[in-house]
Design a protein with these regions (language model features):
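Conserved catalytic cores of phosphodiester-cleaving nucleases, focusing on short active-site segments
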Residues: 16, 39, 59-75, 88
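Interdomain/boundary linker segments immediately adjacent to catalytic/signaling cores
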Residues: 1-17
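A short acidic/basic microdomain associated with nuclease active sites
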Residues: 29, 35-51
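Nuclease catalytic cores
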Residues: 1, 17-21, 25, 29
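Nucleic-acid nuclease catalytic cores
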Residues: 72-120
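A short, cysteine/histidine-rich metal-binding "knuckle" motif
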Residues: 122-145
Length: 145
């Protein structure tokens, strides 16, 4: 996770604020390729219901099938961003995720939110809360309560 954070900080320091999410996304891809990081960009994930595919969602970047990266550009992260990353992780069976928010102003810093599904659930006390559907803010590292 630290390399991912370092890459994001480097991109923001070099480019600055004001660019679209796509520009920051493409910049991360450049660094991942340069450093031989195995990744999939815009990974399509089927959504199944009653054995039928009812739609697809798309994760921004998946690293080595172990970490979901969700990119944002805006003033701050919101609960819906956490829910979105959590959903991708659940559908892919991946335990780690990180949301990266590139701020709108040069004077702000890149914001990170790590999500680890291997942690014990503080709400229900189980470590298999994905199956139970339990989800609380306390599952998220770095979440500003």
């Amino acid at each position: 996770m630290e390399n991912i954070k370092s890459f994001a900080r480097y991109i923001f320091k070099t480019l600055g604020a004001g660019f679209s999410e796509r520009v920051y996304h493409n910049s991360l891809e450049v660094l991942f390729k340069k450093h031989s990081v195995d990744f999939v960009s815009e990974q399509q994930i089927p959504v199944m219901f009653e054995g039928q595919e009812v739609g697809k969602v798309r994760a921004d970047i998946v690293i080595e099938n172990k970490v979901v990266i969700e990119l944002k550009r805006g003033s701050s992260l919101r609960d819906k961003h956490t829910t979105q990353c959590f959903m991708y992780m659940k559908l892919l069976g991946i335990n780690e995720g990180i949301i990266i928010n590139f701020p709108e102003n040069d004077c702000d810093e890149v914001e990170f939110q790590e999500i680890c599904l291997a942690q014990l659930c503080n709400r229900c006390g189980r470590d298999s809360h994905l199956a139970s559907g339990c989800y609380a803010r306390t599952h998220v590292k770095g979440y500003a309560l």
